Structures are given as C-alpha cells and as structure tokens.
Regions:
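Rhodanese-like catalytic fold shared by cysteine-dependent sulfurtransferases
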Residues: 1-20, 27-61, 70-104
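Short, surface-exposed ligand- or partner-binding patches at beta-edge/loop junctions that are enriched
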Residues: 65
Length: 104
C-alpha cells in the first residue's frame, strides 16, 4: 500500500487509465457523494467485501478511499494480503477531497 495525498492521487490516476477507484464507505456515506467512477464496496460488509475483492483483477492498480483514510488503509492492507499488486490509499479520504464528485 502506498499513501497518497490528493494531488499525488490525481496525477497517479491520470497516468494509469486502467486503474480502478474503490469507495469502502457505508451506503449512507456514499449517498452524500462519491468520487466519479468509483466502485462502491462497503468494508463493513465483511465476507461480502472479501468476496467482492476476490472477483477483481489483482494485477491492476486500485485507488481506495473512505471518509477520512482509516478504513481505506485497512482495505488496502487486506488487499495486499490477498495478493493485489498495487494499492493506493487516499490520505484524508473523502473529507479532504476537492476533486469532482457525483451523487448517486
């Protein structure tokens, strides 16, 4: 796992068009807004979260965020243990995000 500031996160995403963004917040949090094109996978859903991860291509880069950066760091750690090659955590999470977002 690599910790990225908002600026680094944006530049890494631009340079890696095959990458995937994952939002690990709760459904209630997501309803307040989310980063465009993010895949929602609630880390609090336990086995459902793990099952969802098992369906993903472990060779791609994953940019993970939550509300403040703690749950996404946990998610990146889990992903690393499952054999994902490249995970990035957004420091400060969605609270610090000033980039484009959408309301589902």
């Amino acid at each position: 796992m690599t910790e990225l500031s908002q600026n680094d996160w944006a530049s890494h995403l631009e340079a890696d068009p095959e990458s995937i963004i994952i939002d690990v917040r709760t459904q209630e949090e997501v309803e307040e807004g989310m980063i465009s094109e993010a895949l929602h996978m609630d880390i609090y859903n336990g086995q459902e979260f793990i099952s969802g991860l098992d369906k993903l291509d472990k060779t791609l880069s994953y940019y993970v965020y939550c509300r403040s950066g703690n749950r996404s760091a946990q998610a990146c750690s889990i992903m690393d243990q499952l054999g994902f090659k490249s995970t990035f955590n957004l420091v400060g999470g969605f609270l610090g995000w000033t980039g484009p977002s959408v309301t589902p």
